[in-house]
Swiss-Prot record:
Protein name per UniProt: Sucrose transport protein SUC5
UniProtKB keywords: Cell membrane, Membrane, Phosphoprotein, Sugar transport, Symport, Transmembrane, Transmembrane helix, Transport
Phylogenetic placement of the source organism: Eukaryota, Viridiplantae, Streptophyta, Embryophyta, Tracheophyta
Protein's pathway: Glycan biosynthesis; sucrose metabolism
GO biological process: seed development; sucrose metabolic process
PANTHER family registered for this protein in UniProt: SUCROSE TRANSPORT PROTEIN SUC1-RELATED, SUGAR TRANSPORTER
TM region(s), chain numbering: 34-54, 68-88, 103-123, 141-161, 180-200, 226-246, 282-302, 334-354, 364-384, 407-427, 441-461, 474-494
CDD domains hit by this protein: MFS_SLC45_SUC (cd17313)
A Gene Ontology cellular-component term: plasma membrane
Length: 512
C-alpha cells in the first residue's frame, strides 16, 4: 500500500500543478498596471501595522495577562493555513466574468470592514452587553475583540494571496517583471506601515472623530478606533480604484478539464501531498522561509510590548503611573516602526539593483539575515542598558535620550532585512512555480503555510518561554537571533539560484 499511496500523492501533486497553471497571459503588462495593483498593499498594511503595534497592548488593557496574550496570535497562522491555500487554489480556477483574482480581493475588503468594526467597538459593545467598567477583565469585550481579530486575519489572507497572484499574472512569467512587481508590493507595504505606525504613535488622533471616545472607550481605545476608520477608508480607495483600472481576464479551463472539476476539489491531504512532491527549489525555499520567520515573528509580535515593558519599564497591569509609562513605550515603539518602514520603502525600490550588485537574490537574502541576527541580539544590550539607567535614575524615570536613540536606530536598521523578506521569497516562489507549471495562487498559498507554521511555533512557545525567564520578551528575541543566523547560512548554501531572466518581449516596454 505504501507504493500505491506514494503514487497517488504524486498524481495529486501533478494534478494540482497542472490544474492550477495560469493561462497563457501573453506579454507582461505595463508597469503602471503592476503599480496600481501593488498599491492595494498600502491599504492592507495600514491595518496590519495597527494590528501589530497596538492590539497586543490593547488586549492586555482589556484584561488578558501578558503570558497569555501570545495565544491571541494563533488566529493568524491557523486562518492563514486554512484560508490562503483555499483562496489561492480557487482563485487559480475562478471562472467569474470579473476575472480570477478580483472577486476574492473584493470579498477580502468586505471582511476587513466587518472586522474593523468589531475590533474598534469591542469595548463599547462589551459594556452594552454587561461588562462592568470597574472589572479588571472585560470578558464580553474580549470575546468580541477576538472575533474581530480572527476576521481581520481571515480578511488579510483573503486579500494578500490573490493580490500577489494577480501581480504574478500581470508579470506573465517574466522573471525580472516578477521581481519588480514584488518589490513594488513591498514598497507599498512600507507606505502602509509608515501611515499605520504614524497614526498609532499620535496620541490625539481621536479628536478627528470626537464620537469615538465614550464611557467604555478611553483615549487609547478612541485612538485605536480612529486609526481603524482611517485604515478602512484607505483600503477602500486603493482597492476599488485598482480593480476598476486593471482588468482581470476571465479564465476558462482547458478542453477536457470541465469533466474532472468535481473530482479535483481542494483537500488538505492533496495539498500536503503536493508539498511532498514539489521540485527541490520550492522545497528549499519553504525550509529557509520557515526558519527565517521563526526569527522575525518574536520581534514583529512583541516589539511595542518590549518597548513598554523592558525599555520604558512600564506595566500594563500596574498602577496609573506604570500604565502611563507602558503606553508611552508602546507609542515610542510605533514611532520606531514608522522609521523602520521608511527605510523599508526606500530599500524596496532598490531590491532589483542591490540584488544584481550582490550576485543574486539568494545571496542578498542570506546576507541581510545576518543583519537581522545582529539586530535581535542587540535587544539584549538595549534592555540591560535601560535597566541599568532605571537603577540609577529611579524605576519610573524612563529611558535616557541615548537609549532612545539606540532603540530607534535598531528599529530603523531592521527595515533593511524586512524589505528583502517582504519581496524576494515571494518573487522566488512565483519564479519557481512558473518554471514547474504550478499555479501562482496555489504556490503562494503553500508559501504562506511556511510563514504560518513559525507564527504558531512562536505563539505557543513565547509565552511559556518568557515566563520561565521572568516574564520579559528577551528569550524569544534571542531565539530569533539564532534562527536568523541559521536561515542566513541556509539561504547562502542550500537555496538554489533562480533561473536567468526571461528574454525581453516586444510588449514589455509599456512603462509609460
Amino acid at each position: 500500500m505504501g507504493a500505491l499511496e506514494a503514487e497517488r500523492a504524486a498524481n495529486n501533486a501533478t494534478a494540482l500543478e497542472t490544474q492550477s497553471s495560469p493561462e497563457d497571459l501573453g506579454q507582461p503588462s505595463p508597469l503602471r498596471k503592476i503599480i496600481s495593483v501593488a498599491s492595494i498593499a498600502a491599504g492592507v498594511q495600514f491595518g496590519w501595522a495597527l494590528q501589530l503595534s497596538l492590539l497586543t497592548p490593547y488586549i492586555q488593557l482589556l484584561g488578558i495577562p501578558h503570558k497569555w496574550s501570545s495565544y491571541m496570535w494563533l488566529c493568524g497562522p491557523i486562518s492563514g493555513m486554512i484560508v490562503q491555500p483555499i483562496v489561492g487554489y480557487h482563485s487559480d480556477r475562478c471562472e467569474s466574468r470579473f476575472g480570477r483574482r478580483r472577486p476574492f480581493i473584493a470579498a477580502g475588503v468586505a471582511l476587513v470592514a466587518v472586522s474593523v468594526f468589531l475590533i474598534g467597538f469591542a469595548a463599547d459593545m462589551g459594556h452594552s452587553f454587561g461588562d462592568k467598567l470597574e472589572n479588571k477583565v472585560r470578558t464580553r469585550a474580549i470575546i468580541i475583540f477576538l472575533t474581530g481579530f480572527w476576521f481581520l486575519d481571515v480578511a488579510n489572507n483573503t486579500l494578500q494571496g490573490p493580490c500577489r497572484a494577480f501581480l504574478a499574472d500581470l508579470a506573465a512569467g517574466d522573471a525580472k517583471k516578477t521581481r519588480v512587481a514584488n518589490a513594488c508590493f513591498s514598497f507599498f507595504m512600507a507606505v502602509g506601515n509608515v501611515l499605520g505606525y504614524a497614526a498609532g504613535s499620535y496620541t490625539n488622533l481621536h479628536k478627528m472623530f470626537p464620537f469615538t471616545m465614550t464611557k467604555a472607550c478611553d483615549i487609547y481605545c478612541a485612538n485605536l478606533k480612529t486609526c481603524f476608520f482611517l485604515s478602512i477608508t484607505l483600503l477602500l480607495i486603493v482597492t476599488f480604484s485598482s480593480l476598476w483600472y486593471v482588468k482581470d481576464k476571465q479564465w476558462s479551463p482547458p478542453q477536457g478539464d470541465k469533466e474532472e472539476k468535481t473530482s479535483s476539489l481542494f483537500f488538505f491531504g492533496e495539498i500536503f501531498g503536493a508539498v511532498r512532491h514539489m521540485k527541490r527549489p520550492m522545497v528549499m525555499l519553504l525550509i529557509v522561509t520557515v526558519i527565517n520567520w521563526i526569527a522575525w515573528f518574536p520581534f514583529i509580535l512583541y516589539d511595542t510590548d518590549w518597548m513598554g515593558r523592558e525599555v520604558y519599564g512600564g506595566n500594563s497591569d500596574g498602577d496609573e503611573r506604570s500604565k502611563k509609562l507602558y503606553d508611552q513605550g508602546v507609542q515610542a515603539g510605533a514611532l520606531g516602526l514608522m522609521f523602520n518602514s521608511i527605510l523599508l520603502g526606500f530599500v524596496s525600490l532598490g531590491v532589483e539593483s542591490i540584488g544584481r550588485k550582490m550576485g543574486g537574490a539568494k545571496r542578498l537574502w542570506g546576507c541581510v539575515n545576518f543583519i537581522l541576527a545582529i539586530g535581535l541580539a542587540m535587544t539584549v544590550l538595549v534592555t540591560k542598558s535601560a535597566e541599568h539607567h532605571r537603577e540609577i535614575a529611579g524605576p519610573l524615570a524612563g529611558p535616557s535620550s541615548g537609549i532612545k536613540a539606540g532603540v530607534f536606530s535598531l528599529f530603523t536598521v531592521l527595515g533593511i532585512p524586512l524589505a528583502i523578506t517582504y519581496s524576494i521569497p515571494f518573487a522566488l516562489a512565483s519564479i519557481f512555480s512558473t518554471n514547474s507549471g504550478a499555479g501562482q495562487g496555489l504556490s503562494l498559498g503553500v508559501l504562506n503555510i511556511a510563514i504560518c507554521i513559525p507564527q504558531m511555533i512562536v505563539s505557543f512557545s513565547s509565552g511559556p518561554l518568557d515566563a520561565q525567564f521572568g516574564g520579559g520578551n528577551l528569550p524569544s528575541f534571542v531565539v530569533g537571533a539564532i534562527a536568523a543566523a541559521v536561515s542566513g547560512v541556509l539561504a547562502l548554501t542550500v537555496l538554489p539560484s533562480p533561473p536567468p531572466d526571461a528574454p525581453a518581449m516586444s510588449g514589455a516596454m509599456g512603462f509609460h
